[in-house]
Amino acid sequence: MRRQLIISFFLVGLISTAVCAQTPIEGFIRDNAGNIVAGASVSLKRAEGTVVQQITSDAIGKFRFAAVEAGAYTLRTEAPGFYGSSYDFVLRARQPLSLTIELQHKQSLQQTVEVKSSSLTVNPEKTGSSYIFTRQDLDLLPDPLTNSTDDLVNNLMPGASDSHDNFLAVRGTEFSLHEFINGVSFLDNTQPQFSPGVSPQIFETVDLMTGGFTPEYGNRFGGVLDITTRSGADLAGHGDVNFRGATLDNYDLNADYGGQAGKLGYYFFVDGFTSGRYLEPPQPQELYDFGKGSRATAQFDWRSGNHDVFKLLLMGGGANFQQPNITKDQEVGRNAQRHLRQQTAILSWLHSFSPDTLISTSLYERTGSDRVLPTSDPDTPVSIASRVPLTLGIKSDLSHYWHGHFLKAGLDLVRLRENESFFFDGRGDPDVFPAFSGGLKGGQASVYVQDHFSPFRDLTVDLGVRYDYFDLVDTGVQTSPRIGLAYHFNKTKSVLHAAYNRYFSPPPIEYSLLASFIGHDAVKLDQRVGNVRLYTQNYYEVGWAQELHPRISLELNAYLHTGRNSFENHEISISRIFVPINFHAARSQGGELVLNMRQLERFGISGRFQYALSKTYFYGPITGGFAGDEPLVAGERIIPAFDQTHTGTAQIFYHNRWGGFWMGSAMRYGSGTIIEHGPRLPQHFTSDLATGFTLWTAEPRHLDFEFDVTNVFDSIYQIAKESEEIPIQYAPSRTIGGSLKFHF
């Protein structure tokens, strides 16, 4: 039966359809009295001025662009007898957008040409909480904020906070950074302990999503990075070479280039980096903490006629880094290391049958390796581990527009292979673990259907359902309904939104076989709690978005989620091997406030302020994975190590067109995480300063300089303590550095 189900899904996938981040835009052209304006010329331009598409409004004043990639755009509208209109907006991946453009009649005695300009500050159809950043937004940020996805999320995603051992927590979960790349998601976690990561420099857009996920986003929760990658066709034969250097051996050299040859667009990116404080160390002064890595990306886009688009994305990376020591281990020469490798390929095909119907297919693959190398000293504990994962999949969607309904149905078929090994010699440590080596094959089959529509004026509904079957170390099946509502108060420029999501989340794939092995064969009988289990959740969210002024918005969100078999990371003794653990139940609730001010051209000022209030509880007993030496009785409540009640971030920047001068600051505050059965760690506040200007220019070439100071006051605060036997980790110390960026 299982084989028949998978085969039938696969055959449907071959004849059915992942949308390559293509989004429809529709709207109506009216005059200021509400009358239809037919025959208006409507052109869609990218932020840099390239015309993407141009159409004419029909007899009822309607226009529609069937497939548009996410990004920043300007919609230019002109009609005889009317002043022109210019409308700026940012298009999210996979969210249809409806607009009403109002044109003003020309006065017969007035000879001057007037163009009405406006912008989309608050999206009236957004039913969840998300924050999109375009390539132009990312280019305006200082380098330390965009070094990695962790840096980006820590500063720009509401409620994100550091957890122990370089993990990040978002909305009550430690496995919280899930990448959705060109419509494809993977089970792999992006934290530096598991992955060399993806550079934000290859992003065309990134949508930082924290709640209200439609069925196509699968069963990711907490924090999702919906990423669209850069296309060479947009670079038009231009590129960059960037070098950054800072104290603590922080160096980064990267370059990119893109262009178009006939119908083929091409984009290349390479990056090499080092750091003398690669991981968060177990004491204020880092010891044996050097890391280095490299990443490369290539993307090819080919358009065949007006109906077919092919895209091939290739990514590869690796990192070698030392496992930081405490002073006692450093003195005896402990030298454990870790090596990570990862390669990804995504081939996508989009076919347009008509302006109303799109069909698309994505084939994807990811392979990698993780090797934990032992220390050569004779005294400290020895840990040896390896992991070789493989993911193969096909993700398919069919999109159709019908009488105001944006319908989408799809499936996702994934084949997984996981090979793991582990050996630990405590050398006097009281913990004893049996050696392990094994492999397992499994997979996931998912189907979904969803609708985005407006039942009546100013109300938008996202309605859908998803079915998932997952089989690896554990088998589970669930049907998950999703609903989101958004009501637009036109007069006050406000949006009230609410969402309910049911989730079915596979266990973290990293060392899940090892965790399940220990769950069955632990030396101590009370640690035999079985396989790592799937996490099921009910998720509720309500929010308010308000336009305070053009390009200035205020958003307030509140959420509650409860679930069974919640996840957390747990380290095996002091092996630096982190395996998943399940708790019987979890409850997390909180609120977030975001004040966003996009750059005001008149003043050259942009800024962003975020505050999050949250509380998370886990309830015993431990129900799967590696239980450790701290068992919980049924109903016993604990606060996880990543829980931080108050979190705040702020960025403020000033840009001046003269000489390309800019300056700004990024600040972060945290009230402190919890120590198990003890007090909270002290609160902390850090600030970064940055400035830059153009050294030389000869269009289109120019050379830019940037100067940065991170953690200005050198506040090396305590981040988190995962358990009694694991040391506290400490935040990065102050760095002083700069960069040169050559654009050609």
Regions found by a protein language model. Give the residues of each.
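Periplasm-facing N-terminal accessory domains of Gram-negative outer-membrane beta-barrel systems
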Residues: 20-124
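Periplasmic N-terminal accessory/gating domains of Gram-negative outer-membrane beta-barrel systems
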Residues: 58, 82-83, 87-102, 111-214, ...
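Transmembrane beta-barrel wall of Gram-negative outer-membrane proteins
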Residues: 245-274, 284-321, 337-359, 401-403, ...
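Outer membrane beta-barrel strand-and-loop segments of large Gram-negative receptors
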Residues: 297-299, 391-397, 435-448, 529, ...
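Face-selective signature of the C-terminal outer-membrane beta-barrel domain
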Residues: 301-319, 339-474, 595, 608
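Conserved C-terminal beta-signal and adjacent last beta-strands/turns
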Residues: 301-303, 637-744
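Surface-exposed extracellular loop regions of Gram-negative outer-membrane beta-barrel proteins
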Residues: 318-320, 326-327, 369-371, 419-427, ...
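Gram-negative outer-membrane beta-barrel transporters
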Residues: 454-460, 558-562, 581-673
